[in-house]
Amino acid sequence: MRQLNDSFNMMIRGAVTKGRYWELRQGASLLIASDALVRAVKLEKSVGVPAVVVADDIEVPDRYWIGRFAQGLMATPVLHFRDRNIVNPFNVAWYRSAGTRATQLMAASPRHKDKYLWFLALHQAVGENRELVPPAVLSRLISEGIIKWTPQQPES
């Protein structure tokens, strides 16, 4: 069982891009040529953090940002963190253990500490219920009356 568990000692990263795509199937073989795939690999490498990053030229529809406020951070598919739109790596079932696991992996692999610290900062931001919406989008949604900002009331 240890060998199986050791195979899951990783963080996932990737990228969402758009571009031309072509494929050819020949029996059991598949040949793919894709601008989007090449761009995704380059973007993933350049960002260098454990996240699935959405390319800057992909416009995320407002409904995803609005959903963050309607259903909460665990239910929204996309987050904005440190100037990047990313696929939300968290859900209700695995949120808490994701932070614990990242901390364990960081202790086991200190040479990758910066990547784990990035992930743990994202984990903390979600736990603190930060907006995690691009500032310009948040301002526009508020100014258009789509969402309303209300200051947090002190607990009594």
How should each PLM-predicted stretch be described?
Residues 37-42, 78:
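Glycine-rich loops and low-complexity Gly/Arg-rich segments
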Residues 10-12, 47-50:
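Short glycine-/polar-rich loops that comprise or flank the Walker A/P-loop
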Residues 28-39, 64-73:
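Short, surface-exposed, charged loop/turn segments at secondary-structure junctions
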Residues 16, 43, 52-54:
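Generic structural hydrophobic/aromatic packing signal, biased to beta-strands
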Residues 3-35:
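Catalytic core of nucleotidyl cyclases, primarily class III adenylyl/guanylyl cyclases
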Residues 49-50, 54-156:
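Intrinsically disordered, glycine/charged-rich C-terminal tails and inter-domain linkers
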Residues 17, 39, 48:
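Residues that flank catalytic or metal-binding motifs in active/ligand-binding sites
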Residues 3-4, 42-46:
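Amphipathic alpha-helical regulatory segments at dimerization interfaces
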